[in-house]
């Protein structure tokens, strides 16, 4: 019934199995991939014809984690998987980025890749396995895909590279580096790094590329036995049309790209495009003309040629800079004084308002992942409204790009955050991109660093970021610092680097062509280091160290530790005690299972009142010490006094006064404030108090005074 083909290899100390022919046989390509006991199914399907009017490549990648893969049932009312989680969105992008450039130029048929996690062993992360399986499925599908790609995760543990570390090993790693590439070249890098050098990171990229070769060979071997016939697709030869268009508007495009202001340049480019389509496009007046959509694609090629040759031939870029110069930078802090921390970061025509908000443990984000549930106390949200590029457009929930850019900035900043013990706040950063002309994610990194310092977050060191680009031709190449949006779109590489004065914290690279050598990457990292240092210097002019304390409008938080066996007493039956503490003092109290108590409020007096109350419950009263107390009940043999938080003790009638007291009610009333000394505890553990040895006016210990008089 099944024609099963299987390829098994040992990879990084684990067994990788790629299988096809048993599941999802109606898909163009389907691969069941297993590593350890993690199982992923990847399918690839493509349309056999192009939709009329299609002028872009409609590739969709959907990565989905089924909760049954970890033996769980979804939370929520409906008990089924809903909208993609942040991780699913990020892994979908991770798979998309290295495979998109490998489809044959001009192919615009719809392609959908679906990667489904069927089983998770809680050791081997399914993201790398999903990338490998997606690559294999595309190679089997017959689509015009110039793969395969391989992928690998690299850690840095105890000074050594670790291939595809387990989730437990990643906790000890100083680097989380994901690399994808073909047999000949690296195509994509994504990482989070704890201030390592450029040499170590680049070494990790090369190590990953070497180690993924075995996977690439395995996919090729599987495809030789199971791939479908290649889809017949021949890119159309448009050289003749391109030559006509160049003669017609080549000079106009060159003139347009000498205009430094973005909006004016776009108007000039748009006018040249309109002129080309009017002259060469199909119309009633020109029945032998060409499809306007085809002309638009050719016009874009001409744009790229003009920009690229201009940079390589003259060393000057669209806005007149040389390849290493960073655009003018201005950093400002405290621009929104009632927020907890704020910054405006402007670099050329790219600008971000970043606001930091500090919260308590109640504000942490609860995340239900396959690996288990946890709370995240550092949040970064990136928003890219259409007005930032002078356009109208959709507003609403964030798209994949916004989620991806926000996560990149999050990874760059997280290694520099203080520990929870040193700074027990939840931190939320919101980056509003108000202008964009390239590298808005790196503007978010810089603005976020300033906003957190303005909020009093004790960062280990400030973080700056820069986006690099590349123009690569047969006769030479140029590495570009601080790229514009056009240089990103028309160039060969988008290379984002973030870090401190001591090392890198994040690196993201997307390469659109083959042929990027380690030497080129090394030059790009070295040039980026210079750019980062310059940007950091400009940021330091606005603020070079965190404020000494959080702002007036931020909540104040103090942390204390209590014995774990006292937690129940602080909470009380059904939460009665802790609710009373919160209601009476106005402070928020958060108690962890390990006895760490976080108390927060808008002012310090409320925090002190709550902490004193908690300590009165958890601390032991000290024999011989004098306390303020309140009479809570008067009886024939004395009075019960509340003197230490929730603790009550008995003042026996003989201990009320040095004079004889016949009836305690003649001397004491309920609610009366008194001063008492703790004498000790009786055989049953009951507390014994005394009023007569304490001066009720001054609180002086009279017994010590009498003892001193006797000695004299």
From Swiss-Prot:
It catalyses: RNA(n+1) + phosphate = RNA(n) + a ribonucleoside 5'-diphosphate. Pfam families: KH_1 (PF00013), PNPase (PF03726), RNase_PH (PF01138), RNase_PH_C (PF03725), S1 (PF00575). GO terms for molecular function: 3'-5'-RNA exonuclease activity; magnesium ion binding; polyribonucleotide nucleotidyltransferase activity; RNA binding. Its main location: cytoplasm. One of its GO terms (cellular component) is cytosol. It is found in: Cytoplasm. One of its GO terms (biological process) is mRNA catabolic process. Keywords: Cytoplasm, Magnesium, Metal-binding, Nucleotidyltransferase, RNA-binding, Transferase. Its EC number is 2.7.7.8. Its cofactor is Mg(2+). Residues 555-614 form the KH domain. Transmembrane segments: none annotated. Mg(2+) binds at residues 488, 494. Involved in mRNA degradation. Catalyzes the phosphorolysis of single-stranded polyribonucleotides processively in the 3'- to 5'-direction. Belongs to the polyribonucleotide nucleotidyltransferase family. This is Polyribonucleotide nucleotidyltransferase. It comes from Caulobacter vibrioides (strain ATCC 19089 / CIP 103742 / CB 15) (Caulobacter crescentus). The lineage of its organism: Bacteria, Pseudomonadati, Pseudomonadota, Alphaproteobacteria, Caulobacterales. The gene is pnp.
């Amino acid at each position: 019934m099944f024609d099963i083909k299987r390829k098994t290899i040992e990879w990084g100390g684990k067994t990788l199995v790629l299988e096809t022919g048993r599941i999802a046989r109606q898909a163009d390509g389907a691969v069941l991939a297993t590593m350890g006991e993690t199982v992923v199914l990847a399918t690839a399907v493509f349309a056999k014809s192009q939709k009329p009017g299609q002028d872009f490549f409609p590739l969709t990648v959907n990565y989905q984690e089924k909760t049954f893969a970890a033996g769980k049932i979804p939370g929520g009312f409906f008990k089924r998987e809903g909208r993609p989680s942040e991780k699913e969105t990020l892994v979908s992008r991770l798979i998309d980025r290295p495979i998109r450039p490998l489809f044959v130029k001009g192919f615009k048929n719809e392609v959908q890749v679906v990667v489904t996690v069927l089983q998770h062993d809680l050791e081997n992360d399914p993201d790398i396995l999903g990338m490998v399986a997606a690559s294999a499925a595309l190679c089997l599908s017959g689509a015009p895909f110039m793969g395969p790609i391989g992928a690998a995760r690299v850690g840095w543990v105890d000074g050594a590279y670790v291939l595809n570390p387990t989730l437990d090993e990643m906790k000890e790693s100083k680097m989380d580096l994901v690399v994808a590439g073909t047999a000949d070249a690296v195509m994509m890098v994504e990482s989070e790094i704890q201030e390592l050098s450029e040499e170590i990171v680049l070494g990790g990229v090369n190590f990953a590329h070497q180690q993924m070769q075995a996977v690439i060979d395995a996919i090729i071997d599987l495809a030789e036995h199971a791939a479908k016939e290649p889809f017949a697709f021949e890119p159309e030869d448009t050289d003749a049309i391109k030559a006509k268009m160049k003669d017609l508007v080549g000079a106009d495009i060159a003139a347009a790209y000498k205009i430094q202001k973005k909006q004016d340049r776009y108007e000039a480019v748009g006018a040249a495009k309109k002129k080309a389509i009017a002259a060469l496009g199909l119309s009633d007046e020109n029945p032998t003309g060409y499809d306007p959509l085809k002309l638009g694609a050719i016009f874009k090629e001409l744009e790229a040629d003009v920009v690229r040759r201009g940079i390589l031939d003259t060393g000057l870029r669209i806005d007149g800079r040389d390849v290493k110069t960073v655009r003018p930078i201005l950093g400002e802090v405290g621009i929104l004084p009632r927020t907890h921390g704020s910054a405006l970061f402007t670099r050329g025509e790219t600008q971000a308002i970043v606001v930091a908000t500090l919260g308590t443990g109640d504000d942490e984000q609860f995340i239900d992942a396959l690996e288990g549930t946890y709370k995240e106390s550092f949040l970064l949200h990136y928003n890219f409204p259409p007005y930032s590029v002078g356009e109208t457009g959709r507003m609403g929930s964030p798209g994949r790009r916004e989620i991806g850019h926000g996560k990149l900035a999050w990874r760059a900043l997280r290694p520099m955050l203080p520990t929870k013990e040193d700074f027990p706040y939840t931190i939320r950063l919101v980056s509003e991109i108000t202008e964009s002309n390239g590298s808005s994610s790196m503007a978010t990194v810089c603005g976020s660093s300033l906003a957190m310092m303005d909020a009093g977050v004790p960062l280990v060191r400030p973080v700056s970021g820069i986006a690099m680009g590349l123009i690569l031709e047969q006769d030479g190449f140029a590495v570009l610092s601080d790229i514009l949006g056009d240089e990103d779109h028309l160039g060969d590489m988008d290379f984002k680097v973030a870090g401190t004065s001591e090392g890198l914290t994040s690196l993201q690279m997307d390469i659109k062509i083959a042929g990027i050598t380690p030497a080129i990457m090394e030059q790009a990292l070295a040039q980026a280091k210079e750019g980062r240092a310059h940007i950091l210097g400009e940021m330091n002019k606005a603020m070079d160290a965190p404020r000494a304390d959080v702002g007036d409008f931020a909540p104040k938080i103090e942390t204390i530790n209590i014995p774990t066996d006292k937690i129940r007493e602080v909470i009380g039956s059904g939460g009665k005690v802790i609710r009373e503490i919160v209601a009476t003092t106005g402070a928020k109290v958060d108690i962890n299972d390990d006895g760490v108590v976080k108390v927060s409020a808008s002012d310090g007096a409320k925090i002190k009142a709550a902490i004193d109350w908690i300590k009165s419950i958890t601390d032991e009263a000290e024999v011989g010490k004098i306390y303020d107390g309140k009479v809570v009940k008067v009886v024939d043999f004395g009075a019960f006094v509340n003197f230490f938080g929730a603790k009550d003790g008995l003042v026996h009638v003989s201990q009320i006064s040095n004079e004889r007291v016949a009836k305690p009610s003649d001397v004491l009333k309920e609610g009366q404030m008194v001063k008492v000394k703790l004498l000790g505890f009786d055989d049953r553990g009951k507390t014994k108090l005394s009023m007569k040895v304490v001066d009720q006016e001054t609180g002086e210990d009279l017994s010590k005074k009498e003892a001193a008089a006797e000695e004299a």
